[in-house]
Design a protein with these regions (language model features):
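Asp-based, Mg2+/Mn2+-dependent phosphohydrolase catalytic module
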Residues: 122, 126, 137-254
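Intrinsically disordered, low-complexity domain-flanking/linker segments in eukaryotic proteins
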Residues: 26-48, 223-228
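Structured helix-beta-strand junction loops
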Residues: 62, 130-131, 162
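Short, acidic loop-to-helix structural element flanking the phosphoryl-transfer center
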Residues: 76-84, 97-136
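A metal-dependent, Asp-based hydrolase signature
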Residues: 29, 41-106
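Asp-based phosphoryl-transfer active-site loop
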Residues: 1-18
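Hydrophobic alpha-helical core bundles mediating ligand binding, dimerization, or RNAP-core interactions
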Residues: 17-25, 56-63, 83, 105-112, ...
């Protein structure tokens, strides 16, 4: 069975989220909230496209920190809730607190439900479905994955979220829970991901691993990635110049 990381592996997040933030800020400055303080209006108006891209990258980093540090013994906090909380913090840090209404903040937090698939994702999944059961294995909550599947026409046979196990990757509870959910041994499962740290954690649980390099997704340096490759974290390596999921299907003879 093939499990897929989702953010960055199946869908591209950077531009999609930046577009929503940029549009919302322009609307707030030019059309809504006519009573915005002048200094807030000026700071928002001064935000460039590159500024919003950097904002989104920082938002993504808060997600990484949140999921990696989450203690499964605590009450579960959804990714949606984290995105909302982190958005408020990031706006405050930039002097943009008060730019958006609470309803708008939640709408923007849900921008992560509206991400576009990479160009090879849909067709690649269709091909892989001929030979394998396919499922998400994402830290995104269930409703988020349902929206991504619906809006992106992603042909997964199953949707599995870390939410199902009250933990977040890289906790072993998620990988082991996913295998157990389908009555499989970990060795009967493979994780497809664009992040080597995710694959290392899956490999330590007994999963097979498939690395699909995506633009601007890998956090490790080239030297660290080469070391990970040499140490056997990855069973199938699809580089950036290849054709993503379609290349995975080709290597399986599909």
């Amino acid at each position: 069975m093939l499990f897929f990381d989702t953010f960055g592996t199946v869908v591209s997040w950077r531009t999609c989220v930046a577009e929503e933030l940029n549009a919302a800020a322009l609307d707030a400055v030019n059309h809504a909230h006519k009573d915005l303080p002048a200094d807030l209006r000026d700071r928002a108006a001064a935000m460039t496209w590159d500024d919003w891209l950097a904002f989104v990258a920082d938002w993504r980093q808060t997600y990484n920190g949140f999921t990696r540090s989450f203690d499964p013994s605590n009450e579960f906090v959804s990714v949606d809730q984290h995105h909302y909380n982190a958005l408020q913090d990031l706006l405050r840090q930039r002097g943009l607190d008060g730019l958006f209404t609470d309803d708008k903040l939640w709408e923007l937090a849900f921008a992560w439900h509206r991400l576009n698939p990479w160009p090879d994702s849909v067709q690649g999944l269709e091909l892989l479905n001929r030979l394998f059961d396919t499922s998400t294995l994402s830290n995104g909550n269930v409703s988020l994955l349902q929206d991504l599947q619906r809006l992106g026409s992603l042909p997964f046979k199953h949707l599995v979220s870390a939410e199902n196990f009250g933990a977040y990757k890289p906790s072993p509870l998620v990988y082991n829970g996913a295998a157990k959910k389908f009555g499989l041994e970990p060795s009967q499962c493979a994780l497809v991901a664009a992040h080597l740290h995710d694959l290392k954690a899956a490999k330590s649980c007994g999963f097979q691993t498939i690395y699909v390099d995506r633009e601007q997704e890998e956090e490790m340096s080239k030297e660290q990635a080469a070391m990970a490759k040499a140490e056997g974290w990855v069973d199938m390596w699809v580089d950036l110049e290849s054709d993503g999921f379609r290349e995975v299907a080709r290597r399986f003879g599909i």
